[in-house]
């Protein structure tokens, strides 16, 4: 899915920050390199996309550090937005922890493209961080909605900024 997302972003002249799962980068290093080659930024999204609250601080940090052997970035986004204060404290010396304010739920098979686009239109504000997913679960929705969202943002005069 990532190569198709990259093509859509290129078509509209936009850059994005991709928060990568370390195990995916390990399995598909050529896709990771292509993201960088096309001028996008990357962030760490853990090695196994784990839910923070289910892990000790030590195990969580170890998982993030394992991902950092494949992903060179000072940015970290906790999977599912789940992270404890103790985990934040342990990671903040090495990472800027980046959350979001607009989640598209593009991975939810029950969500239709129209609903996702409505979310994008209704909740976008100046400075918003919008989350799309370049995953198999999100494929149908992201490939439909991302071009619509980019066209809408251009029409409304929004611009992007890499994190």
Show the residue positions of the predicted features.
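Acidic-and-aromatic substrate-binding clefts and catalytic sites of carbohydrate-active enzymes
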Residues: 19-28, 50-58, 77-84, 105-111, ...
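Active-site beta->alpha N-cap acidic-glycine motif
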Residues: 1-53, 59-66, 72-73
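Charged helix-capping and loop-helix junction motifs
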Residues: 33, 57-64, 112-117, 143-147
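C-terminal domain-boundary segment and adjacent tail
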Residues: 7-16, 24-27, 140-163
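Histidine-centered catalytic micro-motifs
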Residues: 42-48, 81, 131-134
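Anion (oxyanion) recognition and catalysis
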Residues: 10, 36, 91-92, 154
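Structural preference for beta-strand elements that scaffold enzyme active sites
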Residues: 15-17, 39-43, 75-77, 96-97, ...
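His/Asp/Glu-enriched short active-site or ligand-binding loop at hydrolase and phosphoryl-transfer sites
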Residues: 74, 82-123, 157-163
């Amino acid at each position: 899915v990532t190569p198709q997302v990259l093509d859509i972003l290129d078509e509209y002249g936009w850059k994005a920050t991709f928060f990568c799962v370390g195990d995916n980068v390990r399995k598909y290093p050529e896709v990771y390199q292509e993201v960088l080659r096309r001028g996008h930024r990357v962030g760490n999204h853990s090695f196994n996309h784990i839910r923070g609250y289910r892990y000790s601080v030590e195990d969580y940090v170890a998982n993030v550090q394992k991902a950092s052997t494949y992903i060179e970035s000072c940015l970290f986004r906790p999977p599912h937005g789940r992270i404890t204060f103790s985990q934040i404290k342990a990671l903040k010396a090495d990472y800027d922890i980046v959350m979001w304010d607009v989640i598209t739920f593009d991975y939810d098979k029950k969500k239709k493209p129209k609903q996702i686009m409505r979310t994008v239109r209704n909740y976008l504000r100046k400075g918003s961080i919008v989350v799309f997913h370049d995953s198999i679960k999100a494929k149908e929705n992201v490939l439909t909605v991302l071009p619509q969202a980019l066209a809408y943002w251009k029409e409304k005069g929004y611009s992007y900024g890499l994190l």
